[in-house]
Amino acid sequence: MGVPVTFALIAGVLLAVQFTQISMQSMVGQLFHGIDSEALLAVPFFLLVGELMASSDVVQRMIRLAQTLVGHLRGGLAQVVTLFSMFFAGISGSSTADVAVLSRTVAPEMDREGYDRAFTAALIASASTMANLIPPSIMAIVYGATGNVSIGGLFLAGVVPGVLIGLGLMVYSYVWGPPGFKKKRASYSEIALASKEAAMPLMIPVIIMGGILSGWFTPTEAGMIACVYVLLVLIPIYRPRHVYELPRDFMYAGLLYSLPLAAVAAASAFGWMVAYLRGPDIVSTYITGIAGTSGPMIMISLVVLFIIVGDFIDAVPAIIIFMPIINKLTEIGNINPLHMGVVIITTLVFGLITPPYGLSLLVASKYVGVGFGRAVVRSLPLYGVFLLTIAFVVLFPDVVLYLPKLLLPESVGCFKAPGGTGYICPN
């Protein structure tokens, strides 16, 4: 019907106030309680980093590095799109920012080389979803803040599914995608030069994750430090003549943040209302009636549920609304909360390219100038990459949680062994 999700959620809350014993005062309190989180303050900083990078010469340097590494392969520009998305995912944490950057920079060149615009939109949208998995992921921040799960652990756990999606898209582009123009393989000196030019912006993920893992700062402080690094180091080097654009970048990042912030507030009130009406008990009883108390079966049931939910609702409000249900089923199935978190996020990421919602695909198709329906058709073969990744994340938790266990063992429930000689982790 075209009604924004935030307004629809608030309408549901108002109906509950009208026809139940819930007071308006309680609901207003929940609206503000939902956004009263220090962790959520990290989101605008990461959005600002992405916007500052997108409007500078830094992006071109990262694209040149991707071209020297994979531009000679079959489907060269398609490979470049995917590899650049991996790079940029480690900076912005926003798939929308990734779509905007790729649509402005690489999409016109793909058009000149004869790539079908529908394929270009489908690939850009699919590749941009890695920004929601590879740290710093905004979805991980929201999930961690709402579900009381380690954000640093979610960052690390998202690396495996993010890289798997990237590799899957590159394999598809190589085997079945348009061939593109044949280009000469870059020499070692060209690769070294491109790496040197892109080294400073690629330090941002190192600063973010290094600081969080070492305990030097929280995710929110990591976002602030990344902003300072971009403003005081990268911009003077890469964009000295366009400082007058900074207010616009700040304003745009604020606008980008206001949309999910409003959704978070509305979803928090709606989720509290659902919990008050015993929604989690009803849904969890229904799911356990089908899947039993088996952890894998509960997880598969939730995957099916969130594939459907992701088709109609944005990921951020979906996470907040369903968090009470997720927590209850995680406890019933004796599932590691970190594993459950990365499964839910990976599944919701799939919804960014599936109709009728498909936000990333919708934005990419508008930027590229192709109908949404045509872009959906060209996306269908790429769905296999996402479904295989989801299956892998569900079936192989030890692989997905390897990095958190190695670098942040407390995030997966490990505790120090007597004598402090190591960690003991749950099976």
Regions found by a protein language model. Give the residues of each.
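Alpha-helical transmembrane segments of multi-pass membrane transport proteins
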Residues: M1-N427
